[in-house]
């Protein structure tokens, strides 16, 4: 959706103990503040409990400063982002964003030119719109974009040379052109906003990725997602994902996106190697390496074995992935795992057909039809249910 969050999560490179933080004078105006870098780095490393304590300490020391409230909400945002299918953290995030907005509003009543209050309110409203967009509440998300734009422009007036604020402008310029094309329902709202400029938005994000102080990593993330999901260019997305994963090797989201993009480019050896590590970390319970990500990893590991005609190995991966799907909930929608459960069963059925186990194959195709469709999964399952799968020889 219209993603106008300004200084998000991607700050800093060195973590520090919670006891090292002090809140006095914490601001995003002016020079680099290592306290911000230290705390936000905990978020990107998915050290959520430690990040909570870090920013709660800031809030306790200076409750009228919106910085602590905003970044505590960012911990909540990453709890959501790491597994978007899990909505159990949504209400907590909305509450944290509301609290941040309220703190900013109190400051703005005293000083309408308060840079931090303007900036953090814009960021909080932007994140609220971002989540609403991810939940397909497109009109409400667009309205948040409408509320956010004046705050974005005002912060730019107050800090015209700040590269990190350029991040918000880049996001706006890109999505203000692209989103109405994809979601016509938001066009009436967009009528009241300035026109977007897709190319300018990309140029601005590139500038932040090169020269940003706090928003550099977030600019890299958006550039990767834009090229993957909106531009359809996995090759252009990959360098950003490699850089992010190398910066934060324990971040499961960057880990999986890098692996998935490598496979999309046909670089199976590298991609499967990364997915094997995803599976190991998932089995070990490492933060961020959840069941849906584990199913995704096993699907690609199994598909690689299927490609190589290592059918027994493929069956092992697919069977484990399917069993994990059942642990996600009682309903087929809950078991879908972003469509990977359907693909797992489709390829498991195809593998069983190659092994001459027709009854097992049919059960798998029936399971595909019971799950939400992913791509052409239902069409293929119906076809293979009628006629056994046979690999086309080249």
Predicted regions and their residues:
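TPR/Sel1-like alpha-solenoid repeat signature
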Residues: 69-72, 118-121, 125, 166-169, ...
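Alpha-helical linker/edge segments of TPR/alpha-solenoid repeat scaffolds
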Residues: 78-89, 130, 176-184, 232-235, ...
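TPR/TPR-like (Sel1-like) alpha-helical repeat modules
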Residues: 149-156, 193-197, 202, 279-280, ...
């Amino acid at each position: 959706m219209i993603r106008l969050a300004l200084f998000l999560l991607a700050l800093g490179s060195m973590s520090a103990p919670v006891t090292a933080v002090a809140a006095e004078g914490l601001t995003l105006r002016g020079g680099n503040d290592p306290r911000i870098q230290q705390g936000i780095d905990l978020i990107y490393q998915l050290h959520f409990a430690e990040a909570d304590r870090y920013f709660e300490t800031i809030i306790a020391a200076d409750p009228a400063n919106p910085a602590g409230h905003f970044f505590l909400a960012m911990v909540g945002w990453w709890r959501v982002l790491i597994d978007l299918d899990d909505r159990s953290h949504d209400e907590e995030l909305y509450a944290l964003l509301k609290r941040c907005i309220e703190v900013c509003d109190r400051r703005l009543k005293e000083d309408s030119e308060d840079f931090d209050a303007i900036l953090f309110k814009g960021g909080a409203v932007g994140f609220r719109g971002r989540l609403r967009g991810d939940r397909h509440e497109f009109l409400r998300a667009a309205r948040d974009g409408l509320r956010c734009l004046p705050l974005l422009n005002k912060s730019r007036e107050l800090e015209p040379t700040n590269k990190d604020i350029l991040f918000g402008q880049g996001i706006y310029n890109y999505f203000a052109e692209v989103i109405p094309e994809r979601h016509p329902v938001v066009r009436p709202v967009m009528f009241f906003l300035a026109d977007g400029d897709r190319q300018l938005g990309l140029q601005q994000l590139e500038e932040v990725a090169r020269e940003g102080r706090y928003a550099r990593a977030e600019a890299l993330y958006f550039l990767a997602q834009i090229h993957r999901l909106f531009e359809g260019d996995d090759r252009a997305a990959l360098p950003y994902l490699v850089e992010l994963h190398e910066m934060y090797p324990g971040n499961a989201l960057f880990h999986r996106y890098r692996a998935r993009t490598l496979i999309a480019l046909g670089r199976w050896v590298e991609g499967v190697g990364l997915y094997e590590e995803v599976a190991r970390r998932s089995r070990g319970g490492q933060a961020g390496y959840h069941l849906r990500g584990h199913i995704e990893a096993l699907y690609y590991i199994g598909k690689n074995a299927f490609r190589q005609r290592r059918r027994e190995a493929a069956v092992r991966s697919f069977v484990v992935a399917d069993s994990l799907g059942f642990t996600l909930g009682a309903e087929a929608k809950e078991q879908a795992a972003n469509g990977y459960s359907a693909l797992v069963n489709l390829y498991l059925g195809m593998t069983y057909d190659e092994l001459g186990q027709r009854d097992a194959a049919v059960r798998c195709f029936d399971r595909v039809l019971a799950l939400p469709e992913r791509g052409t999964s239902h069409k293929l399952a119906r076809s293979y249910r009628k006629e056994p799968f046979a690999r086309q020889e080249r």
